Amino acid sequence: MPNETNCTLDFEQSVQLFKEYNLFITAFLLFLTIILQYGYATRTKVIYTLKMIVLWCFWPLNIAVGVISCTYPPNTGGLVVAIILTVFACLSFVGYWIQSIRLFKRCRSWWSFNPESNAVGSILLTNGQQCNFAIESVPMVLSPIIKNGVLYCEGQWLAKCEPDHLPKDIFVCTPDRRNIYRMVQKYTGDQSGNKKRFATFVYAKQSVDTGELESVATGGSSLYT
């Protein structure tokens, strides 16, 4: 009869294991803390990209752990709970991809796969350049600014442009809607009277439809040309 080996760690073994790997655990937890706390699109793009990768990895990791829990359940009750949690994780992960793909089809921006938000802002400059940015929700007003020849919106660096490059309408897309914002006010110039150095634009929400950005044309050309 083969010998059965108990792979369960006792308290002393767990303490010893923690002592051996405590430096690695500390460094790993500090890394996650920095990534999750300071990873914003308005700050460091590198840290924000790492944060997105970490968030993308969480769902597959949860599903993998759930499958292991279903394979090696502690008891019948644990098996039922593991199945429920694993199914929930799978449905949530599939739902994320469905919504992201729908949003990508509407605005053609890789920001669609941002796990932090379900909306993407888009500004088509009159020089033909398209600027997309992450946005957490659909606001009533958007206020892009130009500072020293650089366009910002929602605190994010978008492109180098002049005040005359801003269009009459800008958009915020969600998986099922396209929100259209119309320019209602424009302020140009700083204290020195330099109109190219600083400008503020106010866009108010005008209408909502189910169109895609590629249906918008400026000067007879498609948004993607």
UniProtKB/Swiss-Prot annotation:
InterPro entries: GAMMA_CORONA_M, M_CoV. Residues 42-51, 99-225 are intravirion. GO terms for cellular component: host cell Golgi membrane; membrane; viral envelope; virion membrane. The chain crosses the membrane at residues 21-41, 52-72, 78-98. It is found in: Virion membrane; Host Golgi apparatus membrane. Its main location: virion. Signal peptide: none annotated. Belongs to the gammacoronaviruses M protein family. This is Membrane protein. It comes from Avian infectious bronchitis virus (strain Beaudette US).
